[in-house]
Amino acid sequence: MSWQTHTVFNQPGPLNNSNLFLSDGALREALVREGAGWDSDLLASIGQQLGTAESLELGRLANTNPPELLRYDATGTRLDDVRFHPAWHLLMQGLCANRVHNLPWEEDTRAGSFVARAARFMLHAQVEAGTLCPITMTFAATPLLQQALPAEFKEWLTPLMSDRYDSHLLPGAQKRGLLIGMGMTEKQGGSDVLSNTTRAERLADGSYRLVGHKWFFSVPQSDAHLVLAQAKGGLSCFFMPRLLPDGQRNAIRIERL
């Protein structure tokens, strides 16, 4: 007895082993029109790699194996670490290798680099979307940090501008690559960040101690976060590293993912 009830038709086949760039006429035309045609060869290479069955499988694995919050180690020591499936790390390696997080901020950047970066972003987005969050925040934070990074963290600029992904828990200056997250929103302060209650107290050495909470603390495994807090003169933005300059963990507590 057959259990077949119908025949599947009028459905596209699996998207396997296609070039995500060369098959996108609109993207190729826009790239040239907006002044980034010089990146076409590299984008074709990226599109070929991302369109493979193996690459698309990485996206599936990263989404079906969500990150895990590890609050404590076996001895009861507080960690607040986030563990990811290996597929996540491989996807992040590709994004950083293709400089989706910092291409326009290079000293010798070319005209049209924002367009080229956007095209690379679009190709990666077709494989997996979650990894684009840390990449986008790092991209947005980099020009600010290039101008205003505290003196004791200036050595971070080299790994910040690298094409490497480094998931190790190390002081920023010792890493091959960095990620920057953001902590803006609070329970009572969503779009109205002026209502944030996190406070910043200036210490004798010129640094600040932040006390408060964040409703969203995006990419908690980042090497540092830009955090909004109320200082003496009003709302301001602070650079908060995951590890302090002496290598100790900062007092950041993650409640849930």
Where are these regions (language model features)?
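Internal helix-loop-helix
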Residues: D80-P171, S218-P220
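A short core secondary-structure module
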Residues: S207-I252
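Internal maturation/activation junctions in enzymes
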Residues: L149-T198, L203-G206
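Short beta-turn/strand-loop junction motif enriched in small, turn-promoting residues
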Residues: T185-G189, K214-F216, L257
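Glycine-rich beta->alpha junctions and the first turn(s) of the following alpha-helix
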Residues: G130, A251-L257
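Extended, charge-enriched "interface" segments that sit outside catalytic cores
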Residues: M1-R110
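Buried hydrophobic positions in well-ordered alpha/beta secondary-structure cores of metabolic enzymes
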Residues: A141, M182, A200, L210-G212, ...
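Short, solvent-exposed loop/turn segments at the edges of secondary structure
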Residues: T136, G177, V193-S195, P220-S222, ...
